[in-house]
Each structure stands twice: as structure tokens, then as C-alpha cells.
Swiss-Prot record:
Binds 23S rRNA and is also seen to make contacts with the A and possibly P site tRNAs. One of its GO terms (molecular function) is rRNA binding. HAMAP family: Ribosomal_uL16. PANTHER family: 50S/60S RIBOSOMAL PROTEIN L16, LARGE RIBOSOMAL SUBUNIT PROTEIN UL16M. Pfam families: Ribosomal_L16. GO terms for cellular component: cytosolic large ribosomal subunit. Gene3D superfamilies: Ribosomal protein L10e/L16. This is Large ribosomal subunit protein uL16. Part of the 50S ribosomal subunit. GO terms for biological process: translation. It comes from the Bacteria. Belongs to the universal ribosomal protein uL16 family. It comes from Mesoplasma florum (strain ATCC 33453 / NBRC 100688 / NCTC 11704 / L1). Keywords: Ribonucleoprotein, Ribosomal protein, RNA-binding, rRNA-binding, tRNA-binding.
């Protein structure tokens, strides 16, 4: 699972995913990419599931770049606990994805293979996505 080696704060404030992305809007590494059409918190399990779906379909051909990383911990209180008494324990790690963020990039495979691999990854993510090519973002 993806998680940071160390963080400055154990329980940060929630970061908003509303609005459009400021960076990571273009394809920088690969030939094809997966761009988000919504904003959301994407946790480390969803990112890993999408990566595995892509690499299994491509059968170790090509290269995959993950442009998002889960830096922020999300806390949650246990079930049936009364309100108050502080913030809950860190439950999972999330990446903040805004509208227009390129989340994954692929190179070294044909366009139809890349399109299908990224389609499989789309089903693992909680945001609407679209397939983009280099230079057509």
C-alpha cells in the first residue's frame, strides 16, 4: 500500500477537492493518460487497485506513471461512539484529486491497449475520468 514515510502532522485538516487543478493538467511522462472530470479523495487502496488492473492487462509491456500519491491521512471515529472527545484515529491515506488532474500515464503500448487498460482502471476509481493523449489535453 502507498503511504508517506513520515508526515509533519498526524491528523491534518481535511483538504477540499472542489475547484479545478492547478498543476498536473498535462501529460508529462507517457503518451496516454487518465484525467479526472470530478474532484474526490482517492485512497491508497483505490490507487493500488487501478495500478494492478492496468499492469495486468498490459502484461508487463509498457510503463505506468502514477501522478497522484496519498499524502493526507483521513481520521474516523469508531462505530457507536459518542460525539466529542477529540478527533478520531487515522483510518486511511488519501490523495486529493481535483477536476482536470492527470492521475495515471502510460507509454510503450499501442493506443487500443492503453485505452482498454485505462478503462479498466477507471472502474476502480470513485471519479469520472476520460482518456487523453499527449498534446490533446
Amino acid at each position: 500500500m502507498l503511504l508517506p514515510k513520515r508526515t509533519k502532522y498526524r491528523k491534518p485538516h481535511k483538504v477540499s477537492f472542489k475547484g479545478k487543478a492547478k498543476g498536473a493538467k498535462t501529460i508529462n511522462f507517457g503518451e496516454y493518460g487518465l484525467m479526472s472530470l470530478d474532484g474526490a479523495w482517492i485512497d491508497n487502496r483505490q490507487i493500488e487497485a487501478a495500478r494492478i488492473a492496468m499492469t495486468r492487462y498490459m502484461r508487463r509491456d509498457g510503463k505506468v506513471w502514477m501522478r497522484i500519491f496519498p499524502h493526507i491521512s483521513m481520521s474516523k471515529k469508531p462505530a457507536e461512539v459518542r460525539m466529542g472527545s477529540g478527533k478520531g484515529n487515522p483510518e486511511k491515506w488519501v490523495a486529493v484529486v481535483k477536476e482536470g488532474t492527470v492521475m495515471f500515464e502510460i507509454a510503450g503500448v499501442s493506443e487500443e491497449t492503453a485505452r482498454e487498460a485505462l478503462r479498466l482502471a477507471m472502474h476502480k476509481l470513485p471519479v469520472r475520468c476520460k482518456f487523453v493523449k499527449r498534446g490533446e489535453e
